[in-house]
C-alpha cells in the first residue's frame, strides 16, 4: 500500500493558563508513523509536565520498538496515581500506522478515537487488557486511503458544558460533526482546525478544559517539484528542466525567467492568465505539462506569509481561507499544505538584476533567503 499519514494537531489552553495540559507527539520511523496524545491531570504547568513526560516516554519507547507492556509499565512506575483523587496522573491515546497499512490503536481513559471512512463512522473492534493495573483498550485493523483518525482529549467532548450545553458536546455529537465534515474531504490540517474552532465556540472563547484535537489522515504520496530560479550557467538549463520534470505529480515554476526557460526547453508556449482578482500580486501563467506558473519573489514572499499564518499554533481557522484565494501565492501554499507529501526545490544560482545587484553572492540573494 503506497500511502502517507498526514498528522496535524491543534490545542486550546484552559482559560487563564499559559501552558496546555495536553501534549501531542508525532514520530516517524522507518516502518510506521506514530501519533501520541496525552492529557495531564488538571491544567496549567502541572498538567503540562505530566502530559509531556507521558507522551515523551511513549514516543521514545515506541520509536525504539519497545513492547506495549513495557511502555505502560514504565509510565505507571514513573507517574503513579494521584493520592487524593486516585486517578491516573495522565491519560493517553496511541495510534501507530505501519507503512503496509496495519494500524495499532491503544487507549487509556481518553475519549475513544473517531475513525471515519468514506464519510461514515467505523468502529474497529477492541479488546480490554490490564497492564500494570491500568485497563487498556487495544485495537488492530487495516487502514485505507482517505481514512481519518481523530484523537481528542476530554475537553472536546465536554465543550460547552454548563455554558452553551447542559452536558457538553458528547462523543456522539462530535462523531456526527466529524462525519459531516469528512464528507467534504478536508485535509487533516483543516479538519483539526475546524473541530478546534467549533469547541472554542461552544466554550464561548473561554475553554473550561485543555482541548486538543489530533488528526491522522491516510493520503496517497504526492511529489511536488518547485523550480524558482534558473542555473547560473545557461548551458545547464536543459539538464535542470529535465530533472525537474522527472518523477513528480505536481510541478510549480516561479519567476518570469524560470518560466521562459522551462517553456523554451519544453518547446511549449508560455501563456499569461487574465483570470486573477488580487492586484497586489502578478497574475499566473500556463505552460503545458506544468501545474502552476507564477511570478517569483513577490509571490514566494506572500506564499511564506500565508503558510506562517496557517501553521502557527495560535492560528485561527479563518486563516485557512487564505488558501482559497485566487492568486499564485495562495495556490502554492494550498498545494504545499494540503497536497504535498514530498517537496523538491530546484533553485539555480542565477540572479535577476531587476531585483538586486548581480555582483552580490547568491547566498545574499532574495530567493536564497526565501
PLM regions and their residue ranges:
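Short, hydrophobic/aliphatic alpha-helical segments
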Residues: 25-27, 31-38, 141, 193-197, ...
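Catalytic core of PPM/PP2C metal-dependent serine/threonine phosphatase domains
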Residues: 20, 50-119, 136, 188-216
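Acidic loop->beta-strand submotif enriched in PP2C/PPM serine/threonine phosphatases
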Residues: 17-30, 123-162
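C-terminal catalytic subdomain
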Residues: 158-242, 246, 268-272, 276-356, ...
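Juxtacatalytic helix/coil linker segments
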Residues: 1-37
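Primarily the active-site beta-strand->alpha-helix module of PP2C/PPM metal-dependent phosphatases
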Residues: 23-76, 150, 162-172
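Conserved beta-strand-loop-short alpha-helix elements that form
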Residues: 30-43, 107, 142-165, 216, ...
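Active-site beta-strand/loop microenvironment that shapes enzyme catalytic pockets
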Residues: 240-266
Amino acid at each position: 500500500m503506497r500511502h502517507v499519514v498526514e498528522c496535524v494537531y491543534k490545542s486550546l489552553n484552559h482559560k487563564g493558563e499559559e501552558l496546555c495540559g495536553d501534549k501531542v507527539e508525532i514520530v516517524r520511523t522507518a516502518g510506521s508513523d506514530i501519533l501520541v496524545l496525552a492529557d495531564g491531570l488538571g491544567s496549567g504547568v502541572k498538567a503540562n509536565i505530566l502530559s509531556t513526560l507521558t507522551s515523551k516516554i511513549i514516543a521514545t519507547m515506541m520509536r525504539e520498538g519497545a513492547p506495549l507492556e513495557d511502555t505502560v509499565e514504565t509510565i505507571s512506575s514513573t507517574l503513579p496515581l494521584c493520592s487524593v483523587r486516585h486517578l491516573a496522573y495522565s491519560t493517553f491515546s496511541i495510534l501507530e500506522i505501519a507503512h503496509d497499512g496495519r494500524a495499532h490503536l491503544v487507549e487509556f481513559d481518553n475519549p475513544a478515537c473517531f475513525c471515519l471512512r468514506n464519510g461514515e463512522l467505523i468502529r474497529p473492534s477492541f479488546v480490554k487488557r490490564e497492564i500494570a493495573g491500568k485497563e487498556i483498550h487495544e485495537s488492530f485493523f487495516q487502514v485505507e486511503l482517505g481514512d481519518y483518525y481523530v484523537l481528542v482529549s476530554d475537553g472536546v467532548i465536554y465543550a460547552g458544558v454548563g455554558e452553551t450545553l447542559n452536558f457538553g458536546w458528547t462523543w456522539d455529537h462530535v462523531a456526527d460533526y466529524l462525519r459531516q465534515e469528512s464528507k467534504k474531504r478536508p485535509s487533516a490540517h483543516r479538519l483539526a482546525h475546524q473541530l478546534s474552532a467549533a469547541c472554542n465556540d461552544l466554550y464561548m472563547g473561554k475553554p473550561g478544559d485543555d482541548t486538543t484535537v489530533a488528526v491522522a489522515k491516510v493520503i496517497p504520496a504526492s511529489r511536488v517539484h518547485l523550480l524558482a530560479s534558473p542555473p547560473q550557467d545557461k548551458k545547464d538549463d536543459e539538464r535542470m528542466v529535465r530533472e525537474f520534470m522527472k518523477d513528480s505529480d505536481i510541478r510549480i515554476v516561479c519567476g518570469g525567467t524560470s518560466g521562459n526557460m522551462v517553456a523554451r526547453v519544453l518547446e511549449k508556449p508560455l501563456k499569461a492568465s487574465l483570470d486573477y482578482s488580487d492586484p497586489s500580486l502578478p497574475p499566473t501563467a500556463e505552460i503545458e505539462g506544468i501545474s502552476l506558473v507564477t511570478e517569483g519573489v513577490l509571490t514566494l514572499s506572500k506564499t511564506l506569509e500565508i503558510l506562517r499564518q496557517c501553521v502557527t499554533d495560535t492560528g485561527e481557522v479563518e486563516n485557512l481561507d487564505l488558501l482559497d484565494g485566487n492568486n499564485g501565492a495562495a495556490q502554492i501554499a494550498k498545494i504545499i499544505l494540503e497536497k504535498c507529501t514530498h517537496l523538491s526545490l530546484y533553485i539555480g544560482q542565477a540572479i535577476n538584476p531587476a531585483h538586486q545587484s548581480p555582483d552580490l553572492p547568491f547566498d545574499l540573494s532574495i530567493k536564497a533567503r526565501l
